[in-house]
């Protein structure tokens, strides 16, 4: 089983800035030429791999990301500035899907890898670009193109950094709730957790790591008893093991030591290379009087004196910050060791990368009845968006571009007549011969 963290996002690149319509106005130059500048390109949206991130929690908190629009062109041939790009940092191993097609847009498989997901719209041309020998004072301009927009799903196959192990009812699920955003089922009976529960823990310094509350272990798990191999398979991916022990055991120090050794032996039997893994012994339920008395026993003090031990109460959230700090420090060391390189290459799924291509849409012409027609399609929309009919020259250009698509010829073949009206998105134009 792999843990999968996911987040749904709306990604929007910036719109290009509109081109400007202006003319030179200077002393002794009464009929200056056009000098409207071009608009700037819209900002694009990129995703970047960041090995310092371990979850998609940030993406879940902010579901919409937009790059900045390009700035409009101005007088004196001044070009608008480009919109600022948006860079979204995600953990290495994040895969991005187009929600509509379920195609893979990108596999962020390297640290600092930068991937373009939504391209900003091109800035529109100002009227200075349209001057020619036939039209020396054009009022034609282009609106900036719209930036790309996608609904995407980000998925991260999570390898838990830290595994909570312990006998059933040791308080692992309660502790997971205390240190993370996870909400596992908690009840006062054995085997509450039957599948791994995942949580993102965050220290006071905003360092994060992934914690897995693993199913309660019983004697004989290495031989397949109980949840057996299923449990042990999960823990071999963890870099740090937190051994959670109920310090309030009915039989005092003997109970605590026996429980620790039982699980330790099961892990050894499964050949988990424990000597290479950091271990923290977490004595839980210290809010209970029985636990306080048990830890006064010299046997306990001597047995654990050379081990990393911390006393906490998951229920009362006592000493939790110190536990998180201890875990994170151990994790930093563990990630530098060769074990991390060995583990992260195990059981890697083969990945097929699909090239994302925009769907080409045919031009459509509809007879709506009552002398009303409508034209639509991606190509028609681009012309509509690019040439706002705010000036007479733009209206002429708009018609010329539509004519080039062949849609007018299609309308004639379908029987359009002089005086009919043609709807082009929110424009309605009268047809003339």
From Swiss-Prot:
It comes from the Bacteria. GO terms for cellular component: cytoplasm. GO terms for molecular function: GTP binding; GTPase activity; magnesium ion binding. It is an enzyme of class 3 (hydrolase). Residues 160-332 form the OBG-type G domain. Its EC number is 3.6.5.-. Its cofactor is Mg(2+). It is found in: Cytoplasm. One of its GO terms (biological process) is ribosome biogenesis. GTP binds at residues 166-173, 191-195, 213-216, 284-287, 313-315. Mg(2+) binds at residues 173, 193. CDD domains: Obg. Its main location: cytoplasm. It holds the Pfam family MMR_HSR1. Gene3D superfamilies: GTP-binding protein OBG, C-terminal domain, GTP1/OBG domain, P-loop containing nucleotide triphosphate hydrolases. Residues 1-159 form the Obg domain. Keywords: Cytoplasm, GTP-binding, Hydrolase, Magnesium, Metal-binding, Nucleotide-binding. Residues 355-433 form the OCT domain. An essential GTPase which binds GTP, GDP and possibly (p)ppGpp with moderate affinity, with high nucleotide exchange rates and a fairly low GTP hydrolysis rate. Plays a role in control of the cell cycle, stress response, ribosome biogenesis and in those bacteria that undergo differentiation, in morphogenesis control. Belongs to the TRAFAC class OBG-HflX-like GTPase superfamily. OBG GTPase family. Monomer. This is GTPase Obg. It comes from Mycoplasma mycoides subsp. mycoides SC (strain CCUG 32753 / NCTC 10114 / PG1). The lineage of its organism: Bacteria, Bacillati, Mycoplasmatota, Mollicutes, Mycoplasmataceae.
